[in-house]
């Protein structure tokens, strides 16, 4: 249930540095980091059930699905699934010419976005979107963004 992706862009995240330093437990090296990748499907595995096709533009992010059976999943807390597979940590990520990813990890890139624009949305974009979504702020409200690092900069977009 995997696809091979020709990587066109991969954003840099602080988690990639943590991966490089070996601070995530259980990482097997060598490992290519990169969990904010975008590119084109190069090959589709025989057992892929969703109708992904070669040539489709896709992106892969931090969260790539859940097992549905562990304690976290049974509580509905899918993001903390015991068996989650994270690109760049569980398997080689997007800091390579090609990567192999679970088909369940893919997001289709809209035509109006380039790979360079789409890749950072897969972690930094989701992180800042969820912060705003959960803040209670509404259209027209004034908000303060503290810090203008990578996430603060993305939030300003």
What are the residue ranges of the model-derived segments?
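Hydrophobic/small residue at the entry helix of a nucleotide-binding pocket
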Residues: 127, 151-152
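Terminal helix/beta-alpha structural elements that buttress the NAD(P)+-binding lobe
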Residues: 142, 154-157
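Conserved Rossmann-like nucleotide-binding pocket used by diverse enzymes
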Residues: 13, 40, 144
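NAD(P)H dinucleotide-binding glycine-rich loop of Rossmann-like/cofactor-binding domains
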Residues: 66-146
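Glycine-rich beta-strand-centered segment in the early N-terminal region that forms part
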Residues: 1-10, 23-71, 105-116
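Cytochrome P450 core scaffold surrounding the K-helix E-X-X-R motif
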Residues: 15-21
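Cys/His-rich metal-chelating microdomains
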Residues: 10, 16, 61, 73-76, ...
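Generic hydrophobic/aromatic pocket-lining and core-packing "Φ" positions
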Residues: 16, 132, 156-157
């Amino acid at each position: 249930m995997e696809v091979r992706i020709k990587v066109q862009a991969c954003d840099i995240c602080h988690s990639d540095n943590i991966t490089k330093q070996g601070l995530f437990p259980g990482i097997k090296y060598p490992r290519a980091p990169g969990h904010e990748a975008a590119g084109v499907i190069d090959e589709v595995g025989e057992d892929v059930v969703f109708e992904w096709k070669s040539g489709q533009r896709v992106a892969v992010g931090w969260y790539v699905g859940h097992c549905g059976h562990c304690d976290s999943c049974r509580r509905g807390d899918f993001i903390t699934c015991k068996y989650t597979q994270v690109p760049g940590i569980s398997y080689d990520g997007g800091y390579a010419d090609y990567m192999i990813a679970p088909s369940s990890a893919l997001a289709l890139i809209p035509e109006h976005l380039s790979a360079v624009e789409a890749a950072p949305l897969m972690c930094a974009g989701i992180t800042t979107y969820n912060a705003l979504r959960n803040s209670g702020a509404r259209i027209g409200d004034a908000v303060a963004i503290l810090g203008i690092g990578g996430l603060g900069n993305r939030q300003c977009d």
